[in-house]
Amino acid sequence: MKVVAFERKEQGTGASRRLRNAGKTTGIVYGGEAAPQMIELDHNALWHALKKEAFHSSILDLEVAGQSQQVLLRDVQYHPFKQLVLHVDFQRVDAKKKLHTKVPLHFLNAEVSPAVKLSSAIVSHVATEIEVECLPAALPEFLEVDLSKIEAGQSIHAKDIALPKGVALTAHVDAENPVIASATIPAGAVSDAAEGETPAA
């Protein structure tokens, strides 16, 4: 995904306000061996790009002054109540160095699972993203979590995710192995089931 930005020479609150009034958003590019670079971007184009999941989790081709560099979106600052992006941070990516970043989780097949079909359980998504480490070329846009076999009362953990080749959970996620999805039967459904049972004669 390509992003076009422009070099920013003015700094400070006043300069940022003038840029916002002109339909621009301030940003910074940092990391790698190069010095941090102040940039400005078209606000409307950035606003629409931020609505795309891939913009948050993929390697981006950032073009500044005709030169392209690979980056990851690292931070976005929004206005408290206006539909306004105040500032963005991008981190340069080294093709030879592993990066740590969060990848979205896409949950599939819950509707055909035993938990839902046999027990009328509710499958809850406890996490929507997971932190992984890999080389930039191996970074997945998202990870799929197959829920087709989950049963009522069961949970799916981070280590249950099928990871692509070259991708691993970060050390702390691997150690904690957090729950990412669970299947529970609503309290009302349990009560109804109990009331429906008749004692044996």
Curated annotation (Swiss-Prot):
GO CC field: cytosolic large ribosomal subunit
Keyword Transit peptide (UniProt): no
Gene Ontology terms: biological process: translation
Segments crossing the lipid bilayer: none
An example molecular function term from Gene Ontology annotations: 5S rRNA binding
Keywords of the record: Ribonucleoprotein, Ribosomal protein, RNA-binding, rRNA-binding
Pfam families: Ribosomal_L25p, Ribosomal_TL5_C
SUPFAM superfamilies the record matches: Ribosomal protein L25-like (SSF50715)
Protein family (similarity comment): Belongs to the bacterial ribosomal protein bL25 family. CTC subfamily.
Function as written in the Swiss-Prot or TrEMBL entry: This is one of the proteins that binds to the 5S RNA in the ribosome where it forms part of the central protuberance.
HAMAP family the record matches: Ribosomal_bL25, Ribosomal_bL25_CTC
Subunit structure, interactors included: Part of the 50S ribosomal subunit; part of the 5S rRNA/L5/L18/L25 subcomplex. Contacts the 5S rRNA. Binds to the 5S rRNA independently of L5 and L18.
Name by which UniProt lists this protein: Large ribosomal subunit protein bL25
Species this protein is from: Burkholderia multivorans (strain ATCC 17616 / 249)
Lineage: Bacteria, Pseudomonadati, Pseudomonadota, Betaproteobacteria, Burkholderiales
Chain's gene name: rplY
